[in-house]
Amino acid sequence: MTNELHFPDVIDNSMRKELVKCQKIAHWKFERGLNAEIGNEHLVAGGAFAKGMEVMRKMYYQDGEKQAAALQEGIVAVYKQYGQFVPPSGSLKTAERMAGALAYYAENKPFDGEELVPLQLGDGMLGIEVAFNHELPILHPKTNKRLSYCGRFDMLAEDKQGKVWVVDEKTTGRMGDAWAHQWDLDSQMSGYVWGAQKLLKKEGIDKEVVGAVINGISILKYGYDTMRCPTFRQDWEVLRWYEQMLDDVDGWISAFKHQDHDQILDHGCALYNAPCQYAKLCKARDPEKIVGSYAIKFWNPMLRD
């Protein structure tokens, strides 16, 4: 084995998603830090759009600026966050297109007509770009300290009836009914609602988090589109997600201790005609001979990098 085994102190949805897909992915990616893909256009583009929205919302709601001025600063933030990343040839998620998506969203969803506004938090700040990190009742397999689960979403908002919603923007391709309904059982949104509920309780805010609102922004070849998808989460659904997440992490710890990880070994190894980045390792009789072809970069859930 060419690099030391690592087990994360903090778990997030990206980790759990890979873990339940295939424990071996969790081994290669999070225990070993192996990466063939440095720089993901979807993460870079989505992060740039999110930064633009954050800046625009803070200037409008927190600083009292007009939306036109807030939009201009948001566009600057998109380019800055996108940085020097070079997307694949033919990609629709260039820096220019993401800046255009922000302008399109601002025009079609003006803040002065918005039904969901940032919640006032206990520290006097507004619920824009909200992060949480809550302890779990599970001990780290090496340090024996408690693990935690973290998340970060775009806004914690209140509607006109006083109900609280997690709000998250998603950039994507074409949207339709299937895209809208995928969020009803989505683990990321369930985790965000759980995290928001605990956050409000910790801050002494007596309000109910009823679910999540996903604002979809499609980046099309000849334009853009938007779709708003509310998805409710009842208390029993959040509890079910939480207990399942704990079971998944417990299973990962057991696999880590014994270094015996379940593998999918089926079509999931090449979903949508895109082979898993670790497929060649699983195909090799002695994968340790070729792990050197991968870069070492451990996922940091707190920084989303």
Segments and roles (model prediction):
Residues M1-D305:
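RecB-family 4Fe-4S metal-dependent nuclease core
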